[in-house]
Design a protein with these regions (language model features):
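N-terminal mature ectodomain segment of secretory-pathway/periplasmic proteins
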Residues: 55-123, 202-203
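N-terminal leader/targeting segments and the immediate start of mature chains
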Residues: 2-85, 181-183, 239-250
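Acidic/charged, solvent-exposed loop-and-adjacent secondary-structure segments enriched in E/D, K/R, S/T
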Residues: 119-166
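A short, amphipathic edge element
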Residues: 171-178
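Gly/Pro-enriched, hydrophobic low-complexity segments
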Residues: 181-242
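Extracellular/mature segments of secreted proteins
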Residues: 34, 168-170
Length: 250
């Protein structure tokens, strides 16, 4: 998995334990929005961000992400030729959602505090779960595998799962960003923020309190940010459907 190099502000690392499920990306340009871009407004009229630098806007958006009680992120990301489709809702106490690998199945993820559960479908266990035993595949299908979220192997995932840690992973005070065009993504007018030291792009709402709408990695995929501060309920799976991951090498 690639690691962010200096200047690649919006590189986001996503990892899951020893399942060989890695996703890294989000930093490059691309005309992936729903309409053609227009030049960013240069005057304050109708644009509360016009008087701010790109770095100041990014800092405000990152602060809003840190303060969010929840946020939903979704999108495809690609690493080493493998595409993963993420659909996660994050909060300060944990997250829930799915990660899918086209042709290789999918699994549900749930983190609450120091505990993490994942539940793979049959295709996942057959192709990516590290077992070719049909009996074991049948046994594991539909079961929640419980592991410790504090394991060093899971540090990247626990960072992804918390809006505060995710925002902090962008690398400290914003610097070297420039304003790009205004465009429309998912019906929202947004402002593009470009990293002058790389090809990373972020898109934020044009408001007094800008929020990330998309981080775009071009060929590496993208992540869309929606449903800020929506109610998030995290409930442990039933004990009857849970097995201890350490018993199976997780």
């Amino acid at each position: 998995m690639r690691t962010p190099r200096h200047g690649r502000r919006y590189a986001v690392a996503m990892a899951i334990s020893g399942l060989a499920v890695l996703a890294a990306g989000c930093g490059t340009a691309g005309s992936t929005s729903s309409t053609a871009g227009t030049p960013a407004l240069a005057t304050p009229s109708g644009n509360p961000l016009a008087g701010l630098t790109a770095d100041q806007i990014a800092t405000k958006a990152e602060a809003d992400l840190k303060a969010a009680s929840s946020v939903h992120i979704a999108g495809p990301v690609t690493d080493s030729g493998q595409t993963y489709v993420l659909d996660l809702t994050l909060g300060p106490k944990g997250c829930t959602g799915t990660m899918a690998m086209p042709g290789k199945g999918s699994f549900l993820l749930l983190q609450i505090g120091k505990k993490l559960w994942f539940k793979g479908d049959r295709q996942f266990w057959k192709t990516s779960g590290g077992t070719s035993d049909p009996g074991l595949v049948t046994f594991l299908e539909g079961k929640y595998i419980e592991v410790s979220a504090t394991s060093s192997d899971l540090s990247s995932f626990t960072t992804l799962c918390d809006p505060r840690k995710l925002a902090s992973a962008f690398g400290g005070p914003a610097s070297g960003l420039v304003k790009g065009t205004t465009t429309v993504i998912s019906g929202q007018t947004v402002l593009q923020l470009k990293d002058s030291g790389d090809s990373s792009n972020a898109y934020v709402t044009i408001s007094a309190h800008p929020e990330f709408v998309r981080i775009d990695g071009g060929r590496d995929g993208h992540l869309d940010f929606t449903a800020y501060n929506a109610p998030l309920r995290l409930t442990p799976p039933p004990a009857s459907k849970t097995i201890n991951g350490s018993q199976y090498g997780f």
